[in-house]
UniProtKB/Swiss-Prot annotation:
Job description of the protein: Acts as a lysosomal membrane arginine sensor. Forms a complex with MTOR and SLC38A9 on lysosomal membranes in an arginine-regulated manner, leading to arginine efflux which enables the activation of mTORC1 which subsequently leads to RPS6KB1 and EIF4EBP1 phosphorylations. Facilitates cell cycle G1/S phase progression and the translocation of the CDK4-CCND1 complex into the nucleus. CDKN1B and RHOA/ROCK signaling activity are involved in TM4SF5-mediated acceleration of G1/S phase progression.
Subcellular location: Lysosome membrane; Cell membrane
UniProt keywords, alphabetically: Cell membrane, Glycoprotein, Lysosome, Membrane, Transmembrane, Transmembrane helix
Gene name of the encoded protein: TM4SF5
Main location: membrane
Protein's name in the database: Transmembrane 4 L6 family member 5
Pfam families: L6_membrane (PF05805)
Organism: Bos taurus
Annotated GO MF terms: arginine binding
Residues spanning the membrane: 10-30, 46-66, 90-110, 157-177
Self-association state and partner proteins as the record states: Interacts with MTOR; the interaction is positively regulated by arginine and is negatively regulated by leucine. Interacts with SLC38A9. Interacts with SLC7A1; the interaction is negatively regulated by arginine. Interacts with CASTOR1; the interaction is positively regulated by leucine and is negatively regulated by arginine.
Positions glycosylated per UniProt: 120, 137, 154
Length: 196
C-alpha cells in the first residue's frame, strides 16, 4: 500500500474515533443523562476533558490532515509533490499521539479511582482505595445512591474512551511512520496524465 492510500485509510479511521471520544466525554458530564449533579459532583477525570480535548480535538486534526495528505489536489503537484502535506501530517500525528496518550491516562485513572458518588451520607471517591477491584464486583456498584447508576455510566464511558484512545495511539503511530516515509520517499501513486 502506498503512503497516500495508507494516510487516507488512517485519517478516515481517526475521524470517527475522535468523534466517539467527544461524545463519550460529553455524556460523562451528564451522569445517567441528568444535569442535576453536574455542578458539584463530577470526578476530576471528567472535568479534565480528556475525551473532548485529548482523544477528540487533538486527534481530529491529524485525522483530517491524514485524509488531505492521502488525497490529490493542488498541493500534490509541483516540485515537492505530496511531501508538504505529508510533512504537515507528521507534525499533526505527533500531536494526535500526545492527545491520545493523555486521553488514555486520564480515562484509565478514572476507571481505577471510580466516580464521585453519594454513599453512606457523604460524597466522595468511595472506590478510590480498591485499586480498581470494584470493577469486578458489581454488587458494590449499587452502594452509590446518587447519581443513580453512576458507576455503570462511568465504567462504560471510560472503558469506551480507553479502547478508542488505544486505537488512536496505534493509528497515529502508524501515520507518523507512514507520513515520515512519504516525506522522504514521496507518494508511490502514479500521476494522472503523465506522458510515460
Amino acid at each position: 500500500m502506498c503512503t497516500g492510500k495508507c494516510a487516507r485509510f488512517v485519517g478516515l479511521s481517526l475521524i470517527p474515533l475522535s468523534l466517539v471520544c467527544i461524545v463519550a466525554n460529553a455524556l460523562l458530564l451528564v451522569p445517567n443523562g441528568q444535569t442535576t449533579w453536574t455542578k458539584d459532583h463530577l470526578s476530576l477525570q471528567v472535568w479534565l476533558m480528556a475525551g473532548f480535548v485529548g482523544g477528540g480535538l487533538m486527534v481530529l486534526c491529524p485525522g483530517i490532515s491524514a485524509v488531505r495528505a492521502g488525497g490529490k489536489g493542488c498541493c500534490g503537484a509541483g516540485c515537492c509533490g505530496n511531501r508538504c502535506r505529508m510533512l504537515r501530517s507528521v507534525f499533526c500525528s505527533a500531536i494526535g499521539l500526545l492527545g491520545a496518550i493523555y486521553c488514555l491516562s486520564v480515562s484509565g485513572t478514572g476507571l481505577r479511582i471510580g466516580p464521585q458518588c453519594l454513599m453512606n451520607g457523604s460524597w466522595d471517591y468511595h472506590f478510590q482505595d480498591t485499586a480498581g477491584s470494584y470493577l469486578l464486583n458489581r454488587t458494590q456498584w449499587n452502594l452509590c445512591v446518587e447519581p443513580p447508576d453512576v458507576v455503570l455510566w462511568n465504567v462504560t464511558l471510560f472503558s469506551l474512551l480507553v479502547a478508542a484512545s488505544c486505537l488512536e495511539i496505534l493509528l497515529c503511530g502508524v501515520q507518523l511512520v507512514n507520513a515520515s516515509i512519504g516525506v522522504l520517499c514521496g507518494d508511490c501513486r502514479k500521476k494522472q496524465g503523465s506522458s510515460q
